[in-house]
């Protein structure tokens, strides 16, 4: 099970000795920029800082990510702290999840037992349920966007709200975003869709991968065949291998999630009442009110929305005397002429944007 690769040179953020945060190590990079583990010199707390190059990269997705993320305070969501403007980058400071990605944990294990998969799925649904209650749909839920803290029984943390949409602030989603393996059928079609219902599908893909150790709609013989993956998604073609032994209740839940018609797909509230989900449900996940009261006042974002918007506006201006020399991968999938013809003939309703690309994030 592979992740998309990102390569190429990258401008590193300029830091100063007087900065509040000091570098511990680099912890990742992607289409967004670079992420670093930093230490708060005042509190000695470790934080994760995502750096996005100033200028054209500071777009509506970045603004949406920051504003939506700031509004969310839940134990299963990585906590937003603040944004900072450096001479070269916009820095987003957030909680550090020391346990790494759920993706890596599955890769190391091969696949999870049903009980372990349920343990993490319960937390994922708790976090997603809270997001939806706050009128935020994530739209890019996947294993790489679910982190773990460092505790013995790891707490799952949803991160990366770069493609999320708030139904309060934004219109119904219509663009095709998300990692192909996790995209719901309706997101591939040229019509508006309910982002909350699409999130349910992505949660189902995550559950399947935890149980099976492979993506549900990829052909095992041709995992890189993008056209075939999309065809299988639209036709809901998946199977649970014979070597994977799971309960009938679990199979039933998966079958209720992988439903092409969004109106007939199981909802988050229905998942939370499903017998498989309720088994061994931790007490602190039973009531959303108890979850959101676990944060004290010190966890409140210190910056107002107005302050954040001002910083973002300044970040849209490139650093003086510099220009963007590095154009690294955006995470979009190029579709060649032959593939586009095949897609048009097989899948007339596939939504390809004006650039000829289907957008997905990493």
UniProtKB/Swiss-Prot annotation:
Enzyme Commission no: 2.7.11.1
Effect ascribed to mutating residue 140 to A: Loss of kinase activity
Effect ascribed to mutating residue 176 to A: Normal kinase activity, and normal regulation of the ABA signaling pathway
Phosphoserine modification, residue list: 7, 18, 29, 43, 175
Deleted gene: phenotype: Impaired ozone-triggered rapid transient decrease (RTD) in stomatal conductance. Impaired induction of MKKK18 activity after 90 minutes of abscisic acid (ABA) treatment. Delayed CO(2)-mediated and darkness-induced and reduced abscisic acid (ABA)-triggered stomatal closure.
Amino-acid positions noted as binding ATP in the UniProt annotation, renumbered to this chain: 27-35, 50
Compartments where located: Nucleus
Phenotype when changing residue 178 to Q: In ost1-4; no stomatal closure when RH decreases, and insensitivity to ABA
Domain II: annotated span: 319-362
Region (Activation loop): 160-186
Function: Activator of the abscisic acid (ABA) signaling pathway that regulates numerous ABA responses, such as stomata closure in response to drought, darkness, high CO(2), plant pathogens, or decreases in atmospheric relative humidity (RH). Involved in the resistance to drought by avoiding water loss. Required for the stomata closure mediated by pathogen-associated molecular pattern (PAMPs) (e.g. flg22 and LPS) of pathogenic bacteria such as P.syringae pv. tomato (Pst) and E.coli O157:H7.
Official protein name in the record: Serine/threonine-protein kinase SRK2E
Organism annotation: Arabidopsis thaliana
Gene that specifies this protein: SRK2E
């Amino acid at each position: 099970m592979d992740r998309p690769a990102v390569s190429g040179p990258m401008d590193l953020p300029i830091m100063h000795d007087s900065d509040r945060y000091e570098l511990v190590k680099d912890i990742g990079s992607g289409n967004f920029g670079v992420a670093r583990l930093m230490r708060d010199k005042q509190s000695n707390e470790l934080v994760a800082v995502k750096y996005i190059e100033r200028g054209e990269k500071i777009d509506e997705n970045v603004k949406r990510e920051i504003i939506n993320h700031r509004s969310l305070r839940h134990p299963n969501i990585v906590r937003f702290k603040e944004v900072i403007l450096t001479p070269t980058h916009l820095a987003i400071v957030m909680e550090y999840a020391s346990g790494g990605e759920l993706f890596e944990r599955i890769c190391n294990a091969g696949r999870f037992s049903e009980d372990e998969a349920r343990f993490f799925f319960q937390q994922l649904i708790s976090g997603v349920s809270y997001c939806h209650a706050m009128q935020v749909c994530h739209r890019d839920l996947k294993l790489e966007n679910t982190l773990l803290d460092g505790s013995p029984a790891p707490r799952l943390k949803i991160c990366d709200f770069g493609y999320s949409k708030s139904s309060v602030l934004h219109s119904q989603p219509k663009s095709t975003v998300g990692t192909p393996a996790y995209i719901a059928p309706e997101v591939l079609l040229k019509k508006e869709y309910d982002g909350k219902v699409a999130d349910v599908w992505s949660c189902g893909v995550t559950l399947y991968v935890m149980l099976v150790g492979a993506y549900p709609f990829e052909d095992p013989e041709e995992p890189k065949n993008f056209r075939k993956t999309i065809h299988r998604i639209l036709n809901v073609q998946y199977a649970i291998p014979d070597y994977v032994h799971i309960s009938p209740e679990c199979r039933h839940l998966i079958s209720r999630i992988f439903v092409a018609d969004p109106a007939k797909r199981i909802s988050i509230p229905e998942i939370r009442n499903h017998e498989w989900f309720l088994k061994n449900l931790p007490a602190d996940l039973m009531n959303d009110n108890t979850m959101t009261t676990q944060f004290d006042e010190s966890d409140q974002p210190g910056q107002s929305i107005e302050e954040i918007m001002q910083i973002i506006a300044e970040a849209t201006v490139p650093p003086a005397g510099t220009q963007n020399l590095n154009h690294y991968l955006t995470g979009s999938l190029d579709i060649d002429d032959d593939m586009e013809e095949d897609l048009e003939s097989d899948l007339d309703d596939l939504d390809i944007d004006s650039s000829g690309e289907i957008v997905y994030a990493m």
